[in-house]
């Protein structure tokens, strides 16, 4: 009888251990995929790279003038600058608040970012999905606008839906449908069509990791505006990760730096050398 009890105890013990191991493996396999992108921005576009609760992302985004300015203007470095400063703070692991300011049209914006779905290692969820609604106000002076703009007329809105998949340790691809609206437009606003208020596009972007700290990146934002002969936005760059910093250097055909203006921007033609140099500096802080 004692031998039987001992045998049953051993069987139960090993069965329990095996079951626990299977549970641990199941949890491990179903964990979220990490580092789909190196930063919350890939060149100009928001990505599905979400902040953890208590994490702060600070970025400086900068584009210069077109390289067609030649050596006299240091291939655009001396002219046509657009600068954007932005902060994003993770309230939870799935929700963050965003604010920023762009020198183009002196737009101050406020928004949120929700992580709706997360790609899992097991494949039970094949993609990551976020949604980013933004509202901005043109704070330009009356001298710049030439005529009075009410507060409501100065507002612009956008919503983007980044959908991304990390196909391997090296390759990540993303599509971002974007809808944008400007309450009032005119020749004084830095967009391609001074008579059109609403815009819809679908931006494509991706990254390919070359080494542990570098990756190649790209974006393509087609122009669906048939009223003006506006080329699509095209950009290529390189990302360099150094601890808590991610440096991004790129060439782009657009001067715009955030979603509503990216959807409506006046773009150059890459093959005609109508592109410009730009860079982003991304810094992550844990402040909780």
Feature locations, PLM:
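Regulatory/sensor and coupling segments of signal-transduction and defense proteins
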Residues: 1
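A mid-sequence, solvent-exposed acidic-amphipathic segment
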Residues: 175-222
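Transmembrane beta-barrel domains of Gram-negative outer membranes and organellar outer membranes
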Residues: 21-148, 155-159, 164-183, 199, ...
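Substrate-binding/catalytic groove segments of enzymes
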Residues: 210-217, 226-228, 245-248
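Short hydrophobic "helix-edge" motifs at membrane interfaces and signal-peptide entry regions
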Residues: 4-5, 82, 202
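Sec-dependent N-terminal signal peptides
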Residues: 4-13
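Flexible, glycine/proline-enriched loop segments at strand-loop-helix junctions
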Residues: 146-151, 190-193
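Sec/Tat signal peptide C-region and signal peptidase I cleavage site
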Residues: 14-20
């Amino acid at each position: 009888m004692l031998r039987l009890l001992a045998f049953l105890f051993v069987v139960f013990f090993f069965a329990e251990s095996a079951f626990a191991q299977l549970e641990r493996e199941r949890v491990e396999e179903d964990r979220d995929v990490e580092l789909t992108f190196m930063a919350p921005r890939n060149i100009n576009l928001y990505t599905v790279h979400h902040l953890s609760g208590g994490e702060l992302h600070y970025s400086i985004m900068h584009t210069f003038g077109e390289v067609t300015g030649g050596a006299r203007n240091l291939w655009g470095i001396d002219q046509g600058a657009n600068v954007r400063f932005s902060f994003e703070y993770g309230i939870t692991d799935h929700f963050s608040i965003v604010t920023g300011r762009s020198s183009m049209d002196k737009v101050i914006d406020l928004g949120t970012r929700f992580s709706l779905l997360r790609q899992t290692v097991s494949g039970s969820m094949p993609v990551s999905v976020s949604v980013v609604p933004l509202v901005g106000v043109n704070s330009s002076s009356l001298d710049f606008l030439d005529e009075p703009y009410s507060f409501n007329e100065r507002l612009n809105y956008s919503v983007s839906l980044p959908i991304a998949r990390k196909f391997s340790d090296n390759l990540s691809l993303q599509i971002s449908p974007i809808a944008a609206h400007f309450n009032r437009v005119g020749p004084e606003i830095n967009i391609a069509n001074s008579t059109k208020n609403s815009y819809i596009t679908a931006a494509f972007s991706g990254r390919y990791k070359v080494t542990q700290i570098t990756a190649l990146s790209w974006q393509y934002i087609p122009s669906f505006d048939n009223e003006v002969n506006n080329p699509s936005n095209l950009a290529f760059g390189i990302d360099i990760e150094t601890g808590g910093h991610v440096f991004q250097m790129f060439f782009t055909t657009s001067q715009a730096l955030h979603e509503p203006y990216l959807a409506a921007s006046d773009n150059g033609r890459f093959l005609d050398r109508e592109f410009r140099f730009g860079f982003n500096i991304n810094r992550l802080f844990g402040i909780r």
